[in-house]
């Protein structure tokens, strides 16, 4: 077996691998010997079939396996000897693959880009500022007010009052299409909050300004994508009778409100809110700190990037951003999306930082534990109520999904490792300053 270098330019590598006919035949023979003890043929006891007969019957079937094993072995030996780590799966092409005949040498061309040598960074030279926000009384009171509004009740307005946006009207209604009542289109004593958007578009607006005992005919058109296909896109009329008009009234900020949210009393609820707010502030502060760290790391290192990795990342960025701008398009029938120079620059940054963090993690032997993976899967599974088990099984069968869940955990652990050696000072700021810092991340 021979491996000949044909290209070594920057990170690009190309080799010709030659497996001689004799080596390939020996590999086939080896596989036949391995299989012989388990094979039975008429006229022979199990394991006693002559190799010549086995080769005649099974040789062609084993030839492909032997060829693959030989090539894989040559590639593996080459990578171990050279120390190269391919940035992506090597491209492998069999020379004369269409015309190759048994008894001749197998010649394969292998191409790949090697991962670059990545310089070590001195974490002690990294200097960062961590924003610290305390949950003050004003923020807690604001959160309490929002909870009270969420738990609001409705009280009857004075007789003759007109319904306003945000009011609750209690109505009887009967819906019809082309003069015929349709199933599920009628109800009595139905409480509807105007402006909630819970009914067909245009329905609630026509009830603003109505009073108790008013009879109103609401005319709407069902959306084209409406769930009930027989109603989709159809014009409909709803005969409505207004039975009550109620104004919203926020719940009182007292122990009863606290109990609604699972707290023992109002003081305990305030404590829970304070903890939740500070956890939110801490998460936001970490996002700002992490971006600042990545910005510094990006300026500290410079090395050649595998062009194929950058190209793949740029296309992924372009594709993702296109779909964000065209949310109505869910498939891939949109033609080719060419990355812009901005996409390519962002791709270079992501690849550079990704390789740097991966190398730091590799050298420090950073790993993602089974427990951490389980927590990540559980967090994702909660997005599919009632289908958690199915999601677990889906993840178990999909290494790509596992890697998507593992990657951010690994990255965060490497970030923590770098922060341990960096100089990080704390700066206490208000929540508005933190919010501005978060908003600035989206603009970059």
Swiss-Prot record:
Family of this protein: Belongs to the FKBP-type PPIase family. Tig subfamily.
Main location: cytoplasm
Domain of life per record: Bacteria
Location relative to the cell: Cytoplasm
PPIase FKBP-type domain sequence ranges: 166-251
A molecular-function term among this protein's GO annotations: peptidyl-prolyl cis-trans isomerase activity
A Pfam short name: Trigger_N
GO biological process, one term: cell division
Enzyme's top EC category: isomerase
The protein, known as: Trigger factor
Domain notes: Consists of 3 domains; the N-terminus binds the ribosome, the middle domain has PPIase activity, while the C-terminus has intrinsic chaperone activity on its own.
Documented EC number(s): 5.2.1.8
Reactions catalysed, as given in the entry: [protein]-peptidylproline (omega=180) = [protein]-peptidylproline (omega=0)
GO cellular component: cytoplasm
Function: Involved in protein export. Acts as a chaperone by maintaining the newly synthesized protein in an open conformation. Functions as a peptidyl-prolyl cis-trans isomerase.
Keywords associated with the record: Cell cycle, Cell division, Chaperone, Cytoplasm, Isomerase, Rotamase
């Amino acid at each position: 077996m021979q491996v000949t270098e044909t290209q070594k330019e920057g990170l690009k590598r190309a080799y010709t691998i030659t497996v001689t006919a004799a080596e390939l035949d020996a590999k086939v023979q080896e596989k036949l010997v391995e299989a012989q003890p388990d094979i039975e043929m008429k006229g022979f006891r199990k394991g006693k079939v002559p190799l010549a007969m086995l080769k005649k019957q099974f040789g062609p079937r084993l030839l492909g396996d032997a060829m693959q094993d030989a090539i894989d072995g040559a590639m593996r030996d080459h990578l171990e000897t050279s120390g190269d780590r391919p940035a992506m799966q090597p491209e492998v092409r069999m020379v004369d693959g269409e015309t190759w005949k048994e008894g001749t040498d197998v010649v394969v061309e292998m191409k790949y880009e090697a991962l670059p040598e990545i310089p070590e960074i001195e974490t002690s030279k990294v200097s960062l500022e961590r924003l610290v926000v305390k949950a003050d009384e004003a923020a807690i009171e604001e959160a309490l007010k929002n909870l009270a509004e969420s738990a609001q009740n409705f009280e009857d307005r004075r007789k003759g009052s007109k319904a306003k946006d945000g009011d609750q009207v209690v109505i009887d209604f009967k819906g019809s299409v082309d003069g015929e009542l349709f199933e599920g289109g009628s109800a009595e004593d139905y409480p509807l909050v105007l402006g909630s958007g819970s009914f067909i578009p245009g329905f609630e607006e026509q009830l603003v300004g109505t009073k108790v005992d008013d009879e109103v005919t609401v005319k709407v058109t069902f959306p084209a994508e409406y769930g009930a296909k027989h109603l989709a896109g159809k014009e409909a009329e709803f005969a409505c009778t207004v039975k009550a008009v109620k104004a919203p009234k926020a719940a009182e900020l007292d122990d009863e409100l606290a109990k609604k949210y699972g707290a023992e009393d109002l003081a305990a609820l305030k404590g829970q809110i304070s903890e939740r707010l500070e956890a939110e502030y801490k998460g936001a502060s970490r996002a700002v700190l992490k971006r600042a760290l990545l910005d510094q790391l990006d300026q500290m290192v410079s090395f050649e990037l595998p062009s194929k990795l950058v190209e793949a990342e740029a296309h992924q960025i372009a594709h993702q951003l296109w779909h964000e701008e065209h949310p109505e398009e869910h498939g891939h029938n949109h033609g080719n999306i060419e990355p812009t120079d901005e996409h390519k620059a962002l791709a270079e940054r992501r690849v550079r930082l990704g390789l740097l963090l991966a190398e730091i993690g590799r050298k420090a032997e950073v790993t993602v534990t089974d427990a951490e993976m389980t927590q990540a899967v559980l967090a994702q599974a909660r997005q599919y109520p009632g289908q958690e088990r199915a999601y677990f099984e889906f993840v178990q069968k999909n290494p790509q999904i596992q890697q998507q869940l593992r990657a951010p955990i690994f990255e965060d652990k490497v970030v923590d490792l770098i922060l341990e050696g960096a100089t990080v000072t704390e700066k206490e700021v208000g929540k508005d300053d933190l919010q501005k810092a978060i908003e600035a991340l989206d603009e970059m």
